[in-house]
């Protein structure tokens, strides 16, 4: 599997914060971008995982374009981003954190709860289901 970003550009008004970044990552590779503050490293990753929509450029998983896929669709395909900061809402429980993400999908409330239950079981989180993030 190959994840590829081609000529990614991100503009906020007149300010171009990412200027034509291209990157290719093969399955199993670990990638980090080095550069000074404000160079567009985080924004580039955000575009690839779907947190930020690129102004232009394309993102592919293998040969399938995923530029317009929502973040949860990319996650279903195995694309994720581990932030430098804590990635859970610390005052919410494990279950509430999972439900928070599932609320971004097109699933009904009942389907969200079923999916949450499945994920908790799949990752063996039953014993910490009601624990707050800051207590894990």
Where in the sequence are the language-model features?
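Conserved ABC transporter NBD signature motif
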Residues: 57-66, 77, 115
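Short coil-to-helix segment of the ABC ATPase nucleotide-binding domain corresponding to the Q-loop/switch region
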Residues: 91-100
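The feature captures the beta-strand-to-loop junction immediately N-terminal to the Walker
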Residues: 34-36
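Short coil-to-beta microelement around the adenine-binding A-loop and adjacent beta1/P-loop entry
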Residues: 15-16, 73
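Helix-to-loop junction immediately C-terminal to a conserved catalytic motif
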Residues: 49
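ABC ATPase NBD coupling module
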Residues: 65-85, 109-110, 129-130
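Conserved ABC ATPase "signature" region
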Residues: 110-128
């Amino acid at each position: 599997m190959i994840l590829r970003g081609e000529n990614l550009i991100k503009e906020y008004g007149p300010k171009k914060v990412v200027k034509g970044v291209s990157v290719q990552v093969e399955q199993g590779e670990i990638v980090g971008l080095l550069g000074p503050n404000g160079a567009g490293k985080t924004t580039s990753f955000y575009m690839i995982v779907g947190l930020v929509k690129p102004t232009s450029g394309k993102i592919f998983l293998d040969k399938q374009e995923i530029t317009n896929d929502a973040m949860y669709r990319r996650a279903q395909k195995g694309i994720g981003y581990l932030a430098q900061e804590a990635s859970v809402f610390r005052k919410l429980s494990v279950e509430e954190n999972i439900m928070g993400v599932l609320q971004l999908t097109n699933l009904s409330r009942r389907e969200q709860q079923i999916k949450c239950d499945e994920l908790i079981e799949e990752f063996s989180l039953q014993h910490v289901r009601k624990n707050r993030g800051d207590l894990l």
